[in-house]
C-alpha cells in the first residue's frame, strides 16, 4: 500500500475540479501552510468530519540510549497530535472490516 502525497492530492484536484496544475499545487500548499501557521500560533485546527490537530506539551522524562544503555534525559517539548473525528473513524473502521 502506498502513501498519498501532496503531489497526488494536487493531481486529483486538477482532474476532479478542472483547476490547472499550478493552481491545484498552490491550493494544496496554501491549505497545509494555513494548518502550519495555526499550529505555530498555538491554535487548535478543527476539520469538521475529519479530525482535530492539537498541540500538547510533553514534560522532560528519563530515556535510555539503546546502544549503550546509558540513561539520558529526553527534553521537554511540544508535539502535534491528531485525533480523528467520528465520521473518519467510522469510515476507516468500515473499510478495515472489508479487507481480508
UniProtKB/Swiss-Prot annotation:
InterPro entries: Hist_DNA-bd (IPR000119), Histone-like_DNA-bd_CS (IPR020816), IHF-like_DNA-bd_dom_sf (IPR010992), IHF_alpha (IPR005684). GO terms for biological process: DNA recombination; positive regulation of metabolic process; regulation of DNA-templated transcription; regulation of translation. Keywords: DNA recombination, DNA-binding, Transcription, Transcription regulation, Translation regulation. One of its GO terms (cellular component) is cytosol. Residues 54-73 are annotated as: Disordered. GO terms for molecular function: DNA binding; structural constituent of chromatin. It comes from the Bacteria. The keyword DNA-binding applies. Heterodimer of an alpha and a beta chain. This protein is one of the two subunits of integration host factor, a specific DNA-binding protein that functions in genetic recombination as well as in transcriptional and translational control. Belongs to the bacterial histone-like protein family. This is Integration host factor subunit alpha. It comes from Pseudomonas aeruginosa (strain UCBPP-PA14). The lineage of its organism: Bacteria, Pseudomonadati, Pseudomonadota, Gammaproteobacteria, Pseudomonadales.
